[in-house]
Amino acid sequence: MSEDVVKPASGRRQVARAVALSGVWLALRPRIGAAQAAADTLLNVRQFGAKGDAKSEDTRAIQSAVDAAATRGGAVFLPPGVYRSGELQMRPHVSLTGIPAWDYEHGFGSVIRLADARARCLLNITGAFGATIDGLSLDGAKLGAGVHGVWLNKPDYGKQEDTFRIERCQIANFSGDGVRLTRAWCFSIRHSMIAYNAGDGISLRGWDGFFLDNWFSGNHGAGFAAREENASCTFTGNRIEWNREGILIVGGDGYNITGNFFDRAGTCGLAILGGQQISITGNFIKRSGKNAKPGEYDSSQIRLERTRGVTCSANNLQAGRDDNGSGVWSPSYGIVYKELQHCVIGNNVLHDGALQQLMVDLGGHGEGAVVKDNPGCLSPQPKGSA
């Protein structure tokens, strides 16, 4: 694939090719005007000296391109290559766009690889209102300690919505969280893979987020965790798999968790502690509790404690072991619940749903706690299995 530099004086064919690669189309303008507009607002990082050869230090070149795009309401295009970089500061209303070609385990296409173990993060989106990160593989290279992939860190919520977008990206191998959001509101993360990070896949303090069609895979913390104030998030069509914890929500409200696949969490597949006004519907939750001690409540598919106004229905729960037929069978329990008020746990199916007990009632409920019609059976284990 050509890595030609896109310059304002380039011919229309070259500019049009760069435009097509970045997924940006200019329509309803004269052809010459469209080409010139693309050259002015679609900036190729090679134009600013980036090499993308997996050897050179490209931090200054990429940052210069982002800063230039911010002055003209433009976008920055990274042709396929491996760009070694330290911390980059995104700017408001700038799109950082590449070609997504990553696979399940590795980054390909347009890759930005962390080159500074002392960095706080790779992409800092603090204050970058309306920014877009699209089609990139962000590789932490397992450098440093507590280095995040994408980081938003505000002292307060401010008066303006963040409205950033992360699309078609792989964010992997960071020594901190894949995405760390502190006081974020109004944003979306879609069609991405957030995997193999030493912390959480996504750590959220904030609200008004959309998480659609993502993989949260193999993170050493939770696939998704919200441990401080959090609210009003939608999870649809995600796969949350092989993380130390699946989804952990502490004290949140206003969640819609629908149509997701939870697989092989180290502890609970889905834990909601102190939450309210949450809908949990139509999810498949499979073989949770891989690393939990058998008989402890962390060895469960779903755990609901101190919840109000929660609906948990039409979910399918199944026990199991590792893909290759080895490893421990888990979990011990299907749904563990306590201190419910105005909640419904009903019409879930637990065929082969757990090893010891399908439904565990720890009591302490207030009024309006309805738990009924959750059919199923314990999972048989082959004799001599681990």
How would you name each of these model-derived features?
Residues M1-S10:
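N-terminal secretory signal peptides
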Residues A9, R29-F48:
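C-terminal segment of N-terminal export signals and the immediately downstream linker at the start
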Residues V19-G23:
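Sec-dependent signal peptide hydrophobic core
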Residues V45-F77:
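Acidic Gly/Asp/Thr-rich repetitive segments characteristic of extracellular carbohydrate-active
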Residues I62-T71, Y83-T97, Y104-D134, D139-D162, ...:
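Extracellular beta-strand-rich solenoid/capping regions of secreted or surface-exposed proteins
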Residues S85-E87, H106-F108, D116-C121, A141-H148, ...:
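Short glycine/acidic-rich loop motifs that flank beta-strands on beta-rich extracellular proteins
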Residues R91-P92, R118, A128, I133, ...:
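Parallel beta-helix/beta-solenoid
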